[in-house]
Each structure stands twice: as C-alpha cells, then as structure tokens.
Design a protein with these regions (language model features):
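Gly/Pro-biased beta-strand-loop elements
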Residues: 7-115, 119
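Extracellular/luminal recognition modules and glycoprotein regions
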Residues: 1-12, 162
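Intrinsically disordered/low-complexity terminal segments and short unstructured peptides
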Residues: 2, 17, 29, 126-127, ...
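Exported/periplasmic cell-wall-interacting domains
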Residues: 76-170
Length: 170
C-alpha cells in the first residue's frame, strides 16, 4: 500500500479539524476528529480509468498523499433536488470539493485538479443526481455518494480544516 508521507499534524492539525482517510483497497473513507474519535465511515472510490496500481498518468487513480479541502462547489444548494439535465451536474453530483495537494503528489506526475465529488456520467441522468448513486470510476478524483458529501463531509468544513489522506495499492 502506498501511503501519504506527511500527516495533518505537519500542517497545524488542531481542535475542530478533521482527518478523512481514503483507502482505495477497502473502498472506504473514514473521518477522524482531532482527538482521535471515529466520526463515520462511508463507501468511496479513488479509482481512475487505468490499472489498479497506476496513478502517475492523467485519468488514472487518485495520487496517494495528503490533501486538504479547498474550494467548495455546492450545486445542490443552488439547484435543489430536481434540476434539469446538465452535463456538469451529471459528472460531479451535488457537491464538489477541490483537494489541495500538500505533498506535491499531483504536480510531480503532471496532474492537477483532483477533487472529491459525487455524480457519475456513467450513471446517466437523473441517475447521477440520486442520493446514493452507483459509485463509478473517475478521471482520478475521489467519488462518494452525493448524500454523504452533503450530510457528512460538508458539515466538517464548517468546523475547521478537513485533511484527506489517500492510500492506494502499490
């Protein structure tokens, strides 16, 4: 397993902050509070279009390493539960979170734009907008259920910094 080289503590991890651990082998994301309390565990994928052990090329798995949540795009708040067809909404789902690399893990392999989002064009419309849409591979992002992004991840961003560690097959 390939793991992050750094920890949230290297970037000022403090009370109110959260650490989400994404394990692509188990297909789970687990959130931990600053004091080590397990907050929740949900299904997720950190898979791209390539081999299970490949993340160094465009459209392959999420590069392993430590990230933090940056910009938030809350399309669900803008358009509600029953929007008309839209390609962007279909691809990214209810809410998208930019993941800011903290280990140069994207740039060193010529990648950029890794996110955590829902949706899934392979699910069609309105399937990609469903609360618990099937999790399909991405072009390298972390995909979660739309409702988990809204009900579990989004509230954490209001409390403090959310760090995300991605573990990949090696």
């Amino acid at each position: 397993m390939v793991s992050p080289k750094k920890k949230p503590q290297d970037f000022g991890f403090k009370s109110g902050d959260t650490h989400i651990v994404v394990n692509d082998i188990t297909e789970k994301a687990t959130a931990w509070s600053f004091d080590g309390k397990k907050l929740w565990e949900v299904n997720c994928l950190a898979r791209g279009q390539g081999l299970d052990t490949e993340w160094k090329y465009p459209n392959t798995d999420t590069p392993p390493g430590l990230y933090k949540i940056g910009q938030i795009y809350n399309d669900y708040a803008k358009v509600g539960a029953n929007p008309p067809y839209d390609r962007t909404l279909m691809a990214f789902g209810w809410i998208s979170f930019d993941l800011v690399e903290l280990e140069n893990q994207e740039a060193k392999v010529g990648r950029a734009g890794i996110m955590m989002h829902g949706g899934g064009s392979a699910n069609g419309w309105p399937g990609a907008w469903a609360p618990c849409q099937p999790l399909c591979t991405t072009h390298g992002c972390v995909r979660m259920y739309n409702q988990d992004l809204r009900d579990k991840v989004l509230p954490l961003t209001k409390q403090g910094t959310v760090f995300v560690s991605v573990y990949q097959e090696g």
